[in-house]
Every structure is written in structure tokens, then in C-alpha cells.
Amino acid sequence: WERFTEAADTAAATLSKRLVRPGLLPPEEAGALENRADVLVSLGNAYDNQMPSKLFGYFATGKPILHLATCDTDPTLPYLACYPLALVLYAKDGVTPGVTARLNRWLHEVRGRQLPFAETAQLYPEFTPEKVAEEFLRWI
């Protein structure tokens, strides 16, 4: 949040206690927060040659994912396009009534929904734990 202090402060003023900025956490605590979340937020990448592995962890939860894309070449976009509980919002579109209406509609549509892991695994078979382990073993 250090790079986004002003935006985070504005969001906190609007959302009050609904916005949590815990700072750095041990993995167990971060995992517990993720498990309690209704929607997971993915921050877009401006570099088209870097894929955040966290996204696949998010897919594995089966939870809705809100992705905030910074550019059209974000490498996560093809994967998010396959995920039925994803919404991608683009920075270039700004915060307009249309964008906020779209977000509001989506939040109501996905409320309480979660994909079973088996369904997510069918969407991304090459990224299941078994397939990744097979690939590691192939190279050892």
C-alpha cells in the first residue's frame, strides 16, 4: 500500500471499517484473511512478461476475483477471461457511473458464489498441483 497511500486513504475514508490494510502478515494470517474474503482483488501488471502466480492461487479458492488492469497487454487477461467469476476493470476507463454500475451488478451476481475446485481444475488443467508437480519432476 505504500505506493498507493493517497488512494488507499481515500478508499478508507469512504469504506471505513470495511477496508482492511493489515500490512505485511505471516502466510498463515494472510491465508486466513483470504479465506474470509467474499471477493479477491488482483492488481494488474504493467509488464507483459510477468505473470503473478498468486492469480492461480486465487483461482484455486473458487472465489470471485476482481482484477484491476493497468493495460490491455496484462498477461493475466486470457486466464481471467476463462474464469466465470472474474470481473476485469481497466484503469483507462476511470471511475465513472457506468463502471461503478457494472461493478455493483457483478458484486450482486457473484455474492455467495464459489466454484468447486474440480471445476476450476477443468478450466486450467495445466496448472493443477498434480500437473505442476509432474513438470517439476520432469526437470529434476
Place the predicted regions along the sequence by residue.
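Nucleotide-activated donor-binding/catalytic signature segment of Leloir-type glycosyltransferases, i.e.
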Residues: 1-29
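Short loop/turn segments at beta->alpha junctions
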Residues: 25-26, 72, 128
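Short acidic alpha-helix that forms the nucleotide-activated donor recognition element
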Residues: 26-37, 60
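Short alpha-helical segment that forms part of, or immediately flanks, the ligand-binding pocket
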Residues: 31, 53-63, 77-78
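Acidic donor-binding loop of glycosyltransferase active sites
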Residues: 34-49
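Short hydrophobic beta-strand element within catalytic cores of glycosyltransferases
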Residues: 39-41, 57, 64-70
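A charged, aromatic-enriched C-terminal amphipathic alpha-helix characteristic of glycosyltransferases
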Residues: 91-101, 105-140
